[in-house]
């Protein structure tokens, strides 16, 4: 069991230990056999705190015992000795601010013309926090007679488990065998934790010579992100200039900090014409648990800021958000370093259809009858609309820096073996089998496709985050499968044939590529008694590119419900959700990330609905609750 800190930014002076017999094993930073660190794409963090405590909840000590009950009782008797720390903040390992702009050279930033325009401001904040899985999962390590260390655990990043265990034991990765368990995760709770826990059990196994197990909850840490956007509108009601400032709080260590900045940048780009645009994204350090993407919440936060700002602009111009989108959006997005030009015609058509289906314009215009001094009902009312494009996977820069690979082989038995580290989800291999079966014209995909996972020589196919395996990975797999099929059909082909391929797309012209799009409308009521938002109706309409769409409507509903749960809102007793989807196959470069798209759409629409219901001057904070609404209704922003 792990003893975690209850303080932050303190000097760690040691521990007051109870008397423990030979049945117990204590692991601290001082007796870790190898390296006391975990390396996540260049960001190094200690497995256990050694001389100082960086954040509340940081692992300090691990205790193994004969059973869980006695171990827990013994752990409660261990006291942590700390003292004040002369702390000087060091941000040398944090990324520099990310800037992007156009039109500033021609238009300036504070010219006289801008001073005469109307100014519209909005803000949105996704507060940092932890999402902990309800059930504890087991992590088991044992060593065989040949000295091979075996690890059994669920993981969204299997190769990192092996790398971390090898580092902690001061061994090569060839001496570590991973046995991945299947998992079902809502967020990224199996991304980093299993690598740390597997290191602890492996150290204990090496010291005791016995199999060692621990059970821990998966924890996904959500980054805190705040947005502030200002748009200047001319006398004709046209947006002319815009500035956006984003501040990210990833905790004490900024895991993949540059990539998080890039993921946000591509999602805050406006779709309407502007003479000038300026964005600045900076990452600040704090004494909080380090965070990463947390189930696409980075995407969702960026699109939410855009959705709230669209509502603010529409209100200023006496339009509904849907009318504003249809009146001001360009025919296509602007080509930038972040994403290519993308036609918006189909997206605007979905905005038009979902507005009609949900009766959005009428409900938006009449919402004041339920709020403020005109509110005669026992609740506040709001309705929000969002529209957006889907991006998935890592940026081109990150893909080039890491070169994640996978391997296909066509064997002498006419089987196709797939080698790499693949997500052990309950349906993780379904799409892979379908692609291979279709290409090799096999009706029995069970006989055709064999998975070889976690072996000593398996290539590192990267982490299962940002829906990589349902987006870029499948596109790369299709290309490799076609090439392997052509090689296998040659008359002089010598079997087996082995082919390695990138699991990320390194050839994109921009950092990201759009794939799939959608719209959502969320209708909320805020009872004046509880002040906790209740989602009443949801409409979702998406166009997605997937190898197979069986059961996709159920998946979309599930993603939406998980998003609402994580944002601190309830479902009304008469809750209803309507889902529509169509297949988009217009020469897309990647498959769609359904998770990114749906979570972002419903989060954005929900934030806009709550903003309207509570009558905010600028924006909202999420996750939401009664205290936040009371603060806003009281005028304290």
Feature annotation, model-predicted:
Residues 1-349, 353-358, 362-637:
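Cofactor-binding beta-sheet edge motifs in enzyme active sites
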């Amino acid at each position: 069991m792990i003893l975690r800190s209850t303080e932050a930014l303190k000097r760690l002076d040691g521990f007051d230990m109870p008397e423990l017999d030979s049945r117990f094993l204590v692991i601290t930073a001082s007796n870790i056999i190898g390296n006391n660190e975990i390396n996540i794409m260049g960001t190094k963090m200690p497995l256990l705190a050694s001389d100082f405590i960086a954040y509340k909840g940081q692992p300090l000590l691990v205790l193994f015992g004969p059973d869980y009950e006695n171990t827990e009782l013994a752990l409660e008797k261990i006291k942590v000795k700390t003292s004040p720390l002369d702390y000087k903040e060091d941000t040398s390992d944090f990324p520099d601010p990310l800037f992007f702009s156009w039109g500033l050279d021609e238009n300036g930033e504070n010219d006289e013309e801008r001073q005469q325009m109307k100014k519209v401001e909005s803000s949105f904040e996704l507060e940092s926090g932890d999402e902990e899985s309800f059930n504890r999962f087991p992590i088991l390590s044992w060593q065989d007679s040949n000295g091979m260390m075996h690890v059994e655990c669920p993981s969204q990043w299997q190769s990192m488990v092996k790398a971390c265990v090898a580092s902690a034991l001061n061994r090569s990765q060839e001496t570590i065998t991973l046995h991945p368990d299947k998992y079902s995760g809502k967020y990224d709770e199996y991304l980093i934790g299993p690598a740390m826990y597997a290191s602890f059990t492996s150290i204990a196994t090496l010291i005791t010579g016995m199999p060692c197990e621990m059970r821990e909850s998966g924890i996904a840490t959500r980054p805190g992100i705040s947005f502030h956007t200002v748009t200047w509108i001319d006398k004709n009601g046209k947006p002319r200039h815009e500035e956006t400032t984003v501040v990210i709080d990833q905790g004490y260590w900024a895991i993949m900090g540059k990539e998080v900045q890039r993921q946000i940048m591509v999602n805050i780009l406006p779709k309407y014409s502007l003479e000038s645009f300026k964005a600045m994204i900076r990452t600040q350090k704090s004494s909080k648990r380090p965070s990463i993407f947390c189930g696409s919440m980075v995407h969702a936060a960026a699109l939410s800021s855009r959705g709230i700002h669209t509502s603010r602009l529409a209100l200023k111009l006496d339009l509904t958000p849907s009318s504003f989108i249809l009146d001001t959006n360009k025919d296509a997005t602007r080509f930038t370093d972040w994403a290519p030009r993308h036609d918006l015609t189909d997206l605007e058509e979905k905005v038009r259809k979902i507005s009609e289906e949900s009766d959005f314009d009428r409900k938006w215009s009449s919402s004041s009858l339920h709020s403020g001094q005109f509110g005669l009902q026992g609740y506040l009312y709001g309705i929000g609309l969002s529209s957006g494009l889907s991006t998935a996977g890592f940026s081109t820069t990150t893909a080039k820096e890491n070169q994640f690979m996978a391997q296909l082989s066509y064997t002498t038995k006419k089987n196709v073996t797939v080698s790499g580290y693949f997500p052990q989800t309950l349906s993780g291999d379904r799409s892979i089998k379908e692609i291979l079966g279709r290409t090799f014209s096999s009706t029995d995909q069970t006989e055709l496709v064999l998975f070889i996972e976690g072996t000593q020589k398996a290539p590192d196919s990267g982490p299962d985050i940002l829906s990589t395996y349902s987006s870029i990975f499948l596109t790369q797999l299709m290309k490799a499968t076609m090439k392997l099929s052509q090689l296998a059909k040659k008359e002089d082909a010598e079997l087996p044939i082995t082919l390695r391929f990138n699991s990320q797309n390194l050839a994109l012209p921009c950092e990201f590529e759009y794939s799939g799009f959608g719209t959502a409308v969320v209708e909320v009521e805020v009872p004046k008694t509880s002040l906790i938002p209740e989602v009443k109706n949801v409409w979702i309409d998406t166009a997605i590119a997937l190898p197979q769409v069986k059961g996709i409507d159920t998946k979309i509903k599930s993603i939406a419900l998980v998003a609402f749960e994580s944002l601190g809102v309830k479902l009304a007793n008469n809750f209803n959700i309507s889902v529509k989807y169509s297949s988009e196959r217009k020469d897309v470069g990647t498959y769609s990330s359904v998770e990114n798209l749906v979570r972002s759409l419903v989060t954005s629409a929900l934030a806009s609905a709550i903003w309207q219901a509570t009558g905010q001057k600028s924006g909202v904070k999420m996750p939401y609750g009664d205290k936040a609404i009371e603060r806003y209704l009281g005028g304290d922003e």
